[in-house]
Amino acid sequence: MEPHDSSHMDSEFRYTLFPIVYSIIFVLGVIANGYVLWVFARLYPCKKFNEIKIFMVNLTMADMLFLITLPLWIVYYQNQGNWILPKFLCNVAGCLFFINTYCSVAFLGVITYNRFQAVTRPIKTAQANTRKRGISLSLVIWVAIVGAASYFLILDSTNTVPDSAGSGNVTRCFEHYEKGSVPVLIIHIFIVFSFFLVFLIILFCNLVIIRTLLMQPVQQQRNAEVKRRALWMVCTVLAVFIICFVPHHVVQLPWTLAELGFQDSKFHQAINDAHQVTLCLLSTNCVLDPVIYCFLTKKFRKHLTEKFYSMRSSRKCSRATTDTVTEVVVPFNQIPGNSLKN
């Protein structure tokens, strides 16, 4: 398979799409994940963190690492894909993007496996020292993924290309592959196949969880509520994977082949457009991950519900106070002026 020479491809719609999408994700993601960390710090002493809570906190931290780089990417796309910031920040942004993506995949995977064990082996899971295992697994995940991502810190991450007007040059960030590079292709094949291996394991575990829960007889209303929440959690995890991660990894390998020059220019443009959309979908996991926590921990869900009803009550009280004042003031203003003089 010989590489073809092809001109630089661009998808100009991304200069409008990314600043809008990333701005929304940044605001919602910082609020949601910041609130999650605050709730965990307030409700749970560190010594009482079980395995599932350890994974949740680590997943939130991975999301926050990506969120702090979003302003850098917003500036980049607002400048028509021109990296005007210091070069090392491009390396940092690319490194944290990789860390967030695959830490999220890994922690969602171990969360799913935790629930799989809880459903299929409830007694053994209840007796196990899951806190120690949670800490150990989290350390392994961070060391492995940060170690792999450190490559992006030493990589020559920027390259110069002519701008769309042809009047000058722009500096791209992580948008250049050497044509025909077999090592780059092998790395991407490994990443994509590793992802789909994890996804198939998660899909299998979730299907077993759903089947087991549906086969269990429901004897009490409380058990029905627990089962409903567990099913929603499973569906939410699958939705996050299918919406955020699967489209990107379906497109990633064909896009890499096109970038390396192994596909014709017509296909290259189409796959590049699709790649930009999947990058946007990939970043939405920072907003969707906190939704999973509502189905995983009772205290978190209770705290969120109490805050919601507290806000509603405050609005009702405020509205009632305003109505009362209006009822008093309006009749007073309708009193004839001559009667006030008597």
Swiss-Prot record:
Keywords: Cell membrane, Chemotaxis, Disulfide bond, G-protein coupled receptor, Glycoprotein, Membrane, Receptor, Transducer, Transmembrane, Transmembrane helix. The keyword Transferase does not apply. GO terms for molecular function: G protein-coupled purinergic nucleotide receptor activity; G protein-coupled receptor activity; lipopolysaccharide binding; lipopolysaccharide immune receptor activity; phospholipid binding; platelet activating factor receptor activity. GO terms for cellular component: membrane; plasma membrane; secretory granule membrane; tertiary granule membrane. It is a multi-pass membrane protein. This is Platelet-activating factor receptor. PANTHER family: P2Y PURINOCEPTOR-RELATED G-PROTEIN COUPLED RECEPTOR, PLATELET-ACTIVATING FACTOR RECEPTOR. Receptor for platelet activating factor, a chemotactic phospholipid mediator that possesses potent inflammatory, smooth-muscle contractile and hypotensive activity. Seems to mediate its action via a G protein that activates a phosphatidylinositol-calcium second messenger system. The gene is PTAFR. GO terms for biological process: chemotaxis; G protein-coupled receptor signaling pathway; immune response; inflammatory response; inositol trisphosphate biosynthetic process; phospholipase C-activating G protein-coupled receptor signaling pathway. The keyword Nucleotide-binding does not apply. The lineage of its organism: Eukaryota, Metazoa, Chordata, Craniata, Vertebrata. It comes from Homo sapiens. It is found in: Cell membrane. Residues 39-54, 114-133, 206-233, 297-342 are cytoplasmic. SUPFAM superfamilies: Family A G protein-coupled receptor-like. Expressed in the placenta, lung, left and right heart ventricles, heart atrium, leukocytes and differentiated HL-60 granulocytes. Belongs to the G-protein coupled receptor 1 family.
